Amino acid sequence: MRLVVARCEVRYSGRLSAVLPEALRLLMFKSDGSVMVHSDTGGYKPENWMTAPTVIEESDDEIVVRKLGGEDRLDIRLAEIVS
């Protein structure tokens, strides 16, 4: 499991579309390929997530998570990695 605390913007596209504006978030990448995006407010439920199986692509300022066998996609644009 990998935990990242970052100031980031998250865009989901697929069955629906959603944009989470830039804010401080906890990104959780689990060993099964699932990904969860949490904020400091709003309780225990993630603001966005992607269930396994996924493909995760990383660059210096962006993480792209794609659902295998589907069109669902999370684009996480990193402004600052805190930890």
Over which residues does each language-model region extend?
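Short Lys/Arg-enriched alpha/beta "domain-start" segment
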Residues: 1-34
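Acidic, aromatic-enriched beta-alpha/helix-loop junctions
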Residues: 23-64
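Surface-exposed beta-loop interaction hotspot
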Residues: 68-83
